């Protein structure tokens, strides 16, 4: 065994997070680590890599017991981590991000070899399918491209044990395929991987073994070839989940929102589509197709160069999010940490921000109304929290996403836009979010959902609009939906539009 963790215990402020957990890695394997948000996966890996110190238990790396007090010590032993949360320095260039702390210099002079770093950065990212200049400012790139920089950074350390924590959350299917090909090539060279993900399809495609944690405890380890989706879900949640997606019984009504010939130069062009009350319109496409840019423009985050937005049969002038909200539009961003939540604020304060008119009397916030709103929405969305004062950053990914959705449900939207609504969310919380979306649609809310997960798009959508390089290629009816058909149009096939 290249890694042996035995009897690991860890508590924070007296609250046990890991209780007698054991975990092993065989050299050259890709080992999945699964569990619901809050199960202890990331904490266990942070102990392995020296970010946290264990309270008790043993950790052996390559047969030697270790007591890392700093991540640099783990890195020196050949461990690298691709974190779920981006660690990009937005003001630095792509190359500077890849080489931060490891800059190439001219001997004793200390002068940085910028051209060499730019070239190496471009070569490494090209291996992952990303064509970008090393001199490009990292903050200008999309979340998905920033994720590829994080992955390249870890791969450049020449580590022989790599921990990947939700590495594909912001990637398209094509980028995932390229990443997996790279991982398999490294595996052939003896590199060992821990793969943390909530995406069952990826785990069953890539990994050889899987370990499941639940509530900070070790549940078991299975050989992938000898287990099933249902068995792993039951290990994770302690019960069978039943059908993955809600039964599709939606009956769309009148057109709620329509966009006509909407254009934003360099991002999307001449897009026309509509969404009806009581339907879920999926928007699919590869990275760079313009999906997020389109919905952000509808919501007023971005300014359209031309085109029109119509709501309830009337042309709407939306020049900012405040005007979109006034028109009854809610927006769940793909990046909940920077655009969806103020993570240092409490749950109560995050929910209150979009609902001030509902909880205020004569410009004064009513604590009673504020608490009542929290209790109503927390109950409706099954939020697991100690109370309204708990900081958003201390919640699991699934509960953070529920808070983002909750703050928009408070405004009782007519139209709800969700951009990657289940990114970084565990299988149990995903099902709860799917149920919430379906119930909202049944109540007459018009829902637009952008998602990179094709099973999610197919499982939830009434219709699917497919984009390619900023153009709307086709709108598929529910009975036309399949992964093959969506990918056909997402890669540029049959350049025509039908609504």
From Swiss-Prot:
Nucleotide-binding among keywords: yes
GO molecular function list: ABC-type D-ribose transporter activity; ATP binding; ATP hydrolysis activity
Class of the enzyme per the UniProt entry, highest EC level: translocase
Main location: membrane
PROSITE patterns: ABC_TRANSPORTER_1, ABC_TRANSPORTER_2, RBSA
Domain ABC transporter: 3-240, 250-494
Gene3D superfamilies for this protein: P-loop containing nucleotide triphosphate hydrolases
Catalytic activity from the UniProt record: D-ribose(out) + ATP + H2O = D-ribose(in) + ADP + phosphate + H(+)
Enzyme Commission code(s) on record: 7.5.2.7
Binding site for ATP: 35-42
Matching SUPFAM superfamilies: P-loop containing nucleoside triphosphate hydrolases (SSF52540)
Record's bilayer topology term: Peripheral membrane protein
UniProt KW keywords: ATP-binding, Cell membrane, Membrane, Nucleotide-binding, Repeat, Sugar transport, Translocase, Transport
Compartment annotation: Cell membrane
Assigned GO CC terms: plasma membrane
Family annotation (PANTHER family): CARBOHYDRATE TRANSPORT ATP-BINDING PROTEIN MG119-RELATED (PTHR43790), D-ALLOSE IMPORT ATP-BINDING PROTEIN ALSA-RELATED (PTHR43790:SF3)
Task performed by this protein: Part of the ABC transporter complex RbsABC involved in ribose import. Responsible for energy coupling to the transport system.
Assembly description: The complex is composed of an ATP-binding protein (RbsA), two transmembrane proteins (RbsC) and a solute-binding protein (RbsB).
Annotated family: Belongs to the ABC transporter superfamily. Ribose importer (TC 3.A.1.2.1) family.
Name by which UniProt lists this protein: Ribose import ATP-binding protein RbsA
Native source organism of the sequence: Halalkalibacterium halodurans (strain ATCC BAA-125 / DSM 18197 / FERM 7344 / JCM 9153 / C-125)
């Amino acid at each position: 065994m290249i890694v042996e963790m035995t009897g690991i215990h860890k508590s924070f402020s007296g609250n046990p997070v890991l209780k007698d957990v054991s975990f092993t890695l065989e050299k050259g394997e890709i080992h999945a680590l699964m569990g619901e948000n809050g199960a202890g996966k990331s904490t266990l890996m942070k102990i392995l890599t020296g970010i946290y110190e264990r309270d008790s238990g043993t950790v052996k790396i390559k047969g030697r017991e270790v007591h890392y007090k700093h991540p640099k010590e783990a890195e020196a032993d050949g461990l690298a981590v691709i974190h779920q949360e981006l660690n990009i320095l937005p003001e630095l260039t792509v190359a500077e991000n890849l080489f931060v702390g490891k800059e190439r210099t001219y001997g004793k002079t200390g002068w940085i070899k910028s051209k060499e770093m730019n070239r190496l950065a471009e070569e490494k990212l090209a291996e992952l399918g990303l064509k970008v200049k090393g001199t490009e400012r990292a903050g200008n790139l999309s979340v998905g491209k920033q994720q590829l920089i994080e992955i390249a950074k870890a791969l450049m350390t020449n580590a022989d044990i790599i921990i990947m924590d939700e590495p594909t959350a912001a990637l398209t299917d094509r980028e995932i395929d390229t990443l997996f090909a790279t991982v398999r090539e490294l595996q052939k060279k003896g590199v060992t991987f821990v793969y943390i993900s909530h995406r069952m399809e990826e785990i069953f495609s890539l990994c050889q073994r899987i370990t499941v944690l639940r509530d900070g405890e070790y549940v078991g380890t299975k050989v992938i070839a000898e287990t099933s989706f249902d068995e792993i879900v039951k290990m994770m949640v302690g019960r069978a989940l039943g059908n993955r997606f809600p039964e599709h019984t939606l009956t769309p009504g009148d057109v709620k929102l329509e966009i006509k010939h909407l254009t934003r130069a360099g991002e999307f062009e001449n897009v026309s589509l509509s969404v009806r009350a009581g339907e879920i319109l999926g928007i699919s496409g590869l990275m760079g197709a313009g999906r997020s840019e389109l919905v952000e423009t509808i919501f007023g985050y971005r300014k359209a160069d031309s085109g029109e937005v119509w709501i309830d049969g009337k042309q709407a002038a939306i020049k900012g999010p405040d005007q979109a909200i006034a028109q009854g539009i809610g927006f769940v961003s793909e990046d909940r940490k920077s655009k969806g939540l103020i993570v240092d604020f409490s749950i109560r304060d995050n929910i209150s921000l979009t609902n001030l008119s509902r909880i205020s009397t004569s410009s004064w916030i009513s604590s009673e109304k504020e608490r009542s709103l929290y209790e109503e929405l927390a109950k409706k969305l099954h939020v697991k929290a100690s109370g309204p004062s708990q900081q958003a950053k201390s919640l699991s990914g699934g509960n953070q996403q529920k808070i983002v959705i909750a703050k928009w449900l408070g405004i009782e939207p007519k139209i709800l836009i969700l951009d990657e609504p289940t990114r970084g969310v565990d299988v149990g919380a995903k099902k709860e979010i799917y149920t919430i979306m379906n119930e909202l649609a049944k109540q007459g809310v018009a829902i637009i959902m952008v998602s990179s997960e094709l099973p999610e798009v197919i499982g939830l959508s009434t219709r699917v609009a497919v984009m390619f390089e900023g153009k709307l290629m086709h709108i598929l009816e529910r009975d036309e939906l399949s992964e093959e058909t969506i990918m056909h149009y997402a890669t540029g096939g049959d350049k025509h539009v039908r609504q």
